[in-house]
């Protein structure tokens, strides 16, 4: 009897893990498709049917990044591509890739790559 209860408990934990994993994957897909717009933690948590705190814990568990770190990495990749392929203004690239200000974009860029967007473009 106890063995069956333990197995049932284990199955419930596995089901919860699968559900959390699927929810985080849905959030990742949503970020990749919508990175150009402002995305809040609340929006992502609601999409995953989780509280904000639980969502952030699960997201970090599966991606090893916070949701904001992940969003910034997706946005940085897009910005790096635009900086390499176009002559568009840095401000326009920042805004078009979902950053809400030039100063935040430059700060995230420097933190992630060790140089400013302009320095990156020159090299």
Give names to the regions the model predicted.
Residues 1-15, 19-26, 54:
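An amphipathic alpha-helical interaction segment
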Residues 3-5, 52, 56, 106, ...:
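Intrinsically disordered low-complexity regions specifically enriched for long asparagine
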Residues 16, 20, 33, 48:
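Residue-level marker of regulatory loop/turn positions in helix-turn-helix DNA-binding domains and
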Residues 25-43, 60-106, 122-123:
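Terminal helix-turn-helix DNA-binding modules in bacterial transcription factors
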Residues 43-52:
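Helix-turn-helix
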Residues 110:
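Short acidic-aromatic loop segments in the C-terminal HATPase_c
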């Amino acid at each position: 009897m106890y063995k069956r209860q333990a197995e049932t408990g284990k199955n419930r934990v596995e089901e919860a893990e699968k559900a959390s994993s699927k929810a985080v994957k849905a959030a990742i897909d949503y970020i990749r498709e919508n990175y150009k717009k402002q995305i809040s933690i609340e929006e992502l948590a609601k999409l995953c049917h989780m509280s904000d705190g639980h969502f952030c814990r699960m997201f970090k568990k599966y991606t090893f990044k916070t949701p904001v770190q992940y969003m910034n990495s997706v946005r940085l990749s897009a910005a790096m591509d635009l900086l390499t392929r176009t002559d568009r203004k840095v401000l326009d690239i920042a805004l078009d890739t979902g950053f809400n200000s030039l100063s935040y974009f430059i700060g995230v860029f420097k933190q992630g790559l060790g140089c400013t967007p302009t320095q990156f473009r020159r090299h």
